[in-house]
Amino acid sequence: MTNLAFQSSSQIQGRLSAWLVTHKLPHRPLGFDYQGVETIEVRPEDWPSVAVALYVYGFNYLRCQCAYDVAPGGALASVYHLTKVEDVADQPEELCVKLFVSRNNPSVPSSFWIWKSADFQERECYDMFGIVYKNHPHLKRILMPESWLGWPLRKDYITPDFYELQDAY
């Protein structure tokens, strides 16, 4: 898929998408959410350059980073909610960026080096979905024990047999 083909979409292109096109940064507009926040898709290999450009644009706060399983056997998504925090802004500008990866080799460049708040959030997505964030300084399980097998929030995850102890105190 060429960059131009990636940029073309039937979705409405917002102001940030137009800015990214002006600077020849590959992405695909996905429209707006119910609150009017613009949503774009970026390929994982393009994420480092787009993330730096968005930071330079003014998105200095990573409000939330999460992941979800699109469909059983389908792609996984890593989602970044960015906010442009300014002293005099009563309604800060926001953007949602989605990166879709194959569940067979889920790998996304880490944004920790741009937004430090990505640290625990990327670790949680790794722990629950198995998305590897390349160049993350301490990517390891954060909620599950290191010995845990599999990725519990994937739709195709099979729960291991275990027995709950009743009144164990």
From Swiss-Prot:
Instruction: Specify whether Transport is a keyword of the entry.
Output: yes
Tree of life domain: Eukaryota
A GO MF annotation of the entry reads: NADH dehydrogenase (ubiquinone) activity
Q: What reaction gets catalysed by this protein?
A: a plastoquinone + NADH + (n+1) H(+)(in) = a plastoquinol + NAD(+) + n H(+)(out); a plastoquinone + NADPH + (n+1) H(+)(in) = a plastoquinol + NADP(+) + n H(+)(out)
User: Where is this gene product found?
Assistant: Plastid, Chloroplast thylakoid membrane
Matching SUPFAM superfamilies, A to Z? Answer: Nqo5-like
Q: What is its EC number?
A: 7.1.1.-
Top-rank EC class of the record's enzyme: translocase
Per the record, GO CC terms?
Answer: chloroplast thylakoid membrane
Q: Which UniProt keywords apply?
A: Chloroplast, Membrane, NAD, NADP, Plastid, Plastoquinone, Quinone, Thylakoid, Translocase, Transport
Predominant subcellular localization, coarse grouping: plastid
Offer one example of a GO biological process linked to this entry: photosynthesis, light reaction
Query: How does this protein assemble?
Result: NDH is composed of at least 16 different subunits, 5 of which are encoded in the nucleus.
The family annotation for this protein states: Belongs to the complex I 30 kDa subunit family.
Known role: NDH shuttles electrons from NAD(P)H:plastoquinone, via FMN and iron-sulfur (Fe-S) centers, to quinones in the photosynthetic chain and possibly in a chloroplast respiratory chain. The immediate electron acceptor for the enzyme in this species is believed to be plastoquinone. Couples the redox reaction to proton translocation, and thus conserves the redox energy in a proton gradient.
Q: Under which name does UniProt file this protein? A: NAD(P)H-quinone oxidoreductase subunit J, chloroplastic
**Annotated source species:** Zygnema circumcarinatum
